[in-house]
Protein backbone atom coordinates (compact mmCIF):
# COMPACT_ATOMS: atom_id res chain seq x y z
CA UNK A 1 0.00 0.00 0.00
CA UNK A 2 1.38 3.40 -0.99
CA UNK A 3 -0.49 6.13 0.89
CA UNK A 4 0.05 9.08 -1.41
CA UNK A 5 -1.56 11.53 0.99
CA UNK A 6 -0.63 13.55 4.05
CA UNK A 7 0.26 12.24 7.53
CA UNK A 8 -0.35 8.54 6.86
CA UNK A 9 3.04 7.29 8.12
CA UNK A 10 1.74 7.01 11.66
CA UNK A 11 2.12 3.92 13.79
CA UNK A 12 -1.65 3.92 14.25
CA UNK A 13 -2.41 3.81 10.50
CA UNK A 14 0.29 1.27 9.75
CA UNK A 15 -0.76 -0.98 12.62
CA UNK A 16 -4.41 -0.85 11.59
CA UNK A 17 -3.36 -2.16 8.15
CA UNK A 18 -0.69 -4.59 9.36
CA UNK A 19 -2.50 -7.65 8.01
CA UNK A 20 -3.49 -6.07 4.68
CA UNK A 21 -0.14 -5.76 2.90
CA UNK A 22 3.54 -6.65 3.07
CA UNK A 23 4.90 -3.14 2.50
CA UNK A 24 3.52 0.22 3.54
CA UNK A 25 4.85 3.47 2.07
CA UNK A 26 3.72 6.78 3.52
CA UNK A 27 4.68 10.25 4.72
CA UNK A 28 4.99 11.34 8.40
CA UNK A 29 4.35 14.96 7.40
CA UNK A 30 2.21 16.38 4.65
CA UNK A 31 3.14 15.59 1.06
CA UNK A 32 3.17 18.51 -1.35
CA UNK A 33 0.38 18.69 -3.91
CA UNK A 34 2.38 16.98 -6.67
CA UNK A 35 2.44 13.80 -4.61
CA UNK A 36 4.41 10.78 -5.74
CA UNK A 37 6.16 11.39 -9.11
CA UNK A 38 4.58 8.48 -10.97
CA UNK A 39 6.87 8.86 -13.98
CA UNK A 40 9.87 8.24 -11.72
CA UNK A 41 8.44 5.59 -9.40
CA UNK A 42 6.45 3.33 -11.72
CA UNK A 43 9.58 1.92 -13.41
CA UNK A 44 10.64 0.61 -9.99
CA UNK A 45 7.18 -0.75 -9.19
CA UNK A 46 6.36 -2.47 -12.48
CA UNK A 47 9.57 -4.40 -13.14
CA UNK A 48 9.85 -8.11 -12.38
CA UNK A 49 11.84 -7.54 -9.20
CA UNK A 50 9.84 -4.75 -7.62
CA UNK A 51 12.08 -2.19 -5.92
CA UNK A 52 9.94 -0.43 -3.34
CA UNK A 53 12.87 1.24 -1.62
CA UNK A 54 14.12 2.51 -4.98
CA UNK A 55 10.69 4.00 -5.68
CA UNK A 56 10.56 5.66 -2.27
CA UNK A 57 14.07 7.02 -2.72
CA UNK A 58 13.15 8.38 -6.16
CA UNK A 59 10.22 10.18 -4.56
CA UNK A 60 12.42 11.69 -1.87
CA UNK A 61 15.05 12.80 -4.38
CA UNK A 62 12.39 14.33 -6.62
CA UNK A 63 11.36 16.69 -3.83
CA UNK A 64 14.80 17.13 -2.26
CA UNK A 65 16.30 18.22 -5.59
CA UNK A 66 13.47 20.62 -6.36
CA UNK A 67 14.36 24.31 -6.28
CA UNK A 68 11.08 25.59 -4.86
CA UNK A 69 9.50 22.59 -3.10
CA UNK A 70 12.37 20.69 -1.51
CA UNK A 71 10.37 19.29 1.40
CA UNK A 72 9.69 15.60 1.97
CA UNK A 73 9.48 12.88 4.60
CA UNK A 74 8.92 9.29 3.51
CA UNK A 75 9.13 5.79 4.98
CA UNK A 76 8.84 2.19 3.89
CA UNK A 77 7.50 -0.18 6.55
CA UNK A 78 7.81 -3.97 6.63
CA UNK A 79 4.38 -4.81 8.02
CA UNK A 80 5.46 -8.27 9.17
CA UNK A 81 7.57 -6.56 11.85
CA UNK A 82 4.84 -4.42 13.40
CA UNK A 83 3.67 -6.98 15.93
CA UNK A 84 7.18 -7.01 17.40
CA UNK A 85 7.13 -3.19 17.51
CA UNK A 86 3.78 -3.37 19.30
CA UNK A 87 5.05 -5.90 21.85
CA UNK A 88 8.13 -3.81 22.63
CA UNK A 89 6.07 -0.62 22.89
CA UNK A 90 3.52 -2.23 25.19
CA UNK A 91 6.26 -3.23 27.62
CA UNK A 92 7.49 0.37 27.74
CA UNK A 93 3.99 1.81 28.09
CA UNK A 94 2.82 -0.49 30.89
CA UNK A 95 2.86 2.38 33.39
CA UNK A 96 2.04 5.13 30.88
CA UNK A 97 0.95 8.57 32.02
CA UNK A 98 0.27 11.49 29.64
CA UNK A 99 3.36 13.63 29.02
CA UNK A 100 4.19 17.23 28.14
CA UNK A 101 4.67 17.32 24.37
CA UNK A 102 6.07 20.82 23.93
CA UNK A 103 9.65 19.62 23.29
CA UNK A 104 8.75 16.72 21.00
CA UNK A 105 9.47 16.70 17.27
CA UNK A 106 6.22 17.73 15.62
CA UNK A 107 5.25 16.68 12.09
CA UNK A 108 1.95 18.52 11.69
CA UNK A 109 0.98 22.14 11.12
CA UNK A 110 -2.00 24.28 11.96
CA UNK A 111 -5.15 22.46 13.05
CA UNK A 112 -3.93 19.06 11.84
CA UNK A 113 -2.92 16.52 14.45
CA UNK A 114 -0.78 17.20 16.32
CA UNK A 115 1.45 14.30 15.30
CA UNK A 116 4.83 13.63 16.92
CA UNK A 117 7.86 11.50 16.17
CA UNK A 118 7.00 7.99 17.31
CA UNK A 119 10.37 6.92 18.74
CA UNK A 120 10.92 10.20 20.58
CA UNK A 121 7.41 10.06 22.03
CA UNK A 122 7.90 6.50 23.29
CA UNK A 123 11.25 7.49 24.80
CA UNK A 124 9.84 10.48 26.67
CA UNK A 125 6.76 8.57 27.81
CA UNK A 126 8.72 5.63 29.22
CA UNK A 127 12.15 6.94 30.25
CA UNK A 128 11.38 6.51 33.96
CA UNK A 129 10.24 2.88 33.73
CA UNK A 130 12.20 0.08 35.40
CA UNK A 131 14.95 -1.45 33.24
CA UNK A 132 14.36 1.30 30.69
CA UNK A 133 17.65 0.93 28.79
CA UNK A 134 17.09 -2.75 28.06
CA UNK A 135 13.44 -2.26 27.14
CA UNK A 136 14.13 0.73 24.91
CA UNK A 137 16.98 -1.10 23.16
CA UNK A 138 14.52 -3.89 22.34
CA UNK A 139 12.03 -1.30 21.06
CA UNK A 140 14.69 0.38 18.92
CA UNK A 141 15.73 -2.95 17.43
CA UNK A 142 12.13 -3.81 16.59
CA UNK A 143 11.50 -0.40 15.03
CA UNK A 144 14.71 -0.50 12.99
CA UNK A 145 13.68 -3.88 11.58
CA UNK A 146 10.26 -2.50 10.65
CA UNK A 147 11.48 0.69 8.96
CA UNK A 148 13.37 -0.58 5.93
CA UNK A 149 13.78 2.93 4.47
CA UNK A 150 13.27 6.47 5.69
CA UNK A 151 14.43 9.86 4.56
CA UNK A 152 13.58 13.43 5.37
CA UNK A 153 14.58 16.95 4.50
CA UNK A 154 15.85 19.33 7.18
CA UNK A 155 12.59 21.25 7.05
CA UNK A 156 9.03 20.81 5.90
CA UNK A 157 7.76 24.28 5.04
CA UNK A 158 7.91 26.06 8.42
CA UNK A 159 8.63 22.90 10.46
CA UNK A 160 12.24 22.18 11.38
CA UNK A 161 12.88 18.43 11.37
CA UNK A 162 15.64 17.45 13.77
CA UNK A 163 14.75 13.77 13.89
CA UNK A 164 12.44 11.35 12.16
CA UNK A 165 12.13 7.71 13.19
CA UNK A 166 10.02 7.00 10.11
CA UNK A 167 6.67 7.00 11.90
CA UNK A 168 4.56 9.54 13.74
CA UNK A 169 2.10 9.10 16.58
CA UNK A 170 -0.73 10.78 18.45
CA UNK A 171 -0.02 11.81 22.04
CA UNK A 172 -2.53 10.10 24.32
CA UNK A 173 -3.95 12.48 26.93
CA UNK A 174 -6.90 10.52 28.39
CA UNK A 175 -8.84 13.81 28.18
CA UNK A 176 -12.15 12.53 26.87
CA UNK A 177 -12.04 14.76 23.78
CA UNK A 178 -13.76 13.67 20.58
CA UNK A 179 -10.37 12.93 19.02
CA UNK A 180 -9.39 10.79 21.98
CA UNK A 181 -12.70 8.91 21.97
CA UNK A 182 -12.07 8.00 18.35
CA UNK A 183 -8.48 7.06 19.17
CA UNK A 184 -9.77 4.61 21.79
CA UNK A 185 -11.34 2.58 18.94
CA UNK A 186 -8.02 1.94 17.18
CA UNK A 187 -6.13 -1.34 17.40
CA UNK A 188 -2.94 0.46 18.44
CA UNK A 189 -4.53 2.06 21.49
CA UNK A 190 -6.30 -1.11 22.55
CA UNK A 191 -3.21 -3.29 22.14
CA UNK A 192 -0.70 -0.90 23.74
CA UNK A 193 -2.06 1.50 26.34
CA UNK A 194 -3.32 0.97 29.90
CA UNK A 195 -7.06 1.61 29.99
CA UNK A 196 -7.70 2.39 33.65
CA UNK A 197 -7.25 6.15 33.44
CA UNK A 198 -9.54 6.92 30.54
CA UNK A 199 -12.21 9.55 31.15
Spans of model-derived segments:
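Terminal, contiguous helix-loop blocks that mediate binding/assembly
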Residues: 1-199
Amino acid sequence: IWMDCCYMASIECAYELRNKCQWYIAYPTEILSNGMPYNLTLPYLTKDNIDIVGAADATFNYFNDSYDSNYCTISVVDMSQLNRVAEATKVLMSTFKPIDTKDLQKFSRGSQGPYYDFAQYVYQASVNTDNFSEKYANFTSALNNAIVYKNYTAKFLNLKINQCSGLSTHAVMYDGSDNEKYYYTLDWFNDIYPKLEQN
